[in-house]
Amino acid sequence: MKKIFLSFLLFCTLSTSYAKIDIERIDPPFWWTGMQDRELQIMLYGKNIADCKIKIDYPGVTLTKAVSLDSKNYLFLYLSIAPETQPGNFDIQLSRKREKQNIPYALNARTIQGKNRKG
C-alpha cells in the first residue's frame, strides 16, 4: 500500500511540473506604436505561469521586467517601446523547463494623435 501511495504521489508531482503553459487571458490584447508613454504593462493570466521565463524579440521592444504576484496564476510584463518602433506582430515567448508557448501580440499603428482628438 505504501508503494502505491508513493507512486501516486510521484506521478502527481511529475504531472504538475510538466503541465502545459496555457495563457487564458492577456490585457491589453494589443497596443499602439507612437504613444507618448513608452512603458507598456501587460497582464498575463494562466494556471501556474509565474515561474515562466519570458523572451521578446522584436525591434524597438524591450522587456524591462517580469513581475509575479503571490498568486502563481498572474504575470505582469513591463515593456519599453522605442519611439521608432514599427507596427507589427511579435511573439511573447514563455518557457518553463521543457515546455514552450508563443503568445502572439500586436502593435498597431496609431491613426490619430491624442492631442488632435476632438470631443
Segment roles from a protein language model:
Residues 14-18, 86:
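Long, low-complexity, intrinsically disordered N-terminal extensions of eukaryotic proteins, enriched
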Residues 4-14:
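Sec-dependent N-terminal signal peptides
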Residues 19-51, 99-118:
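Beta-strand/beta-sandwich contexts
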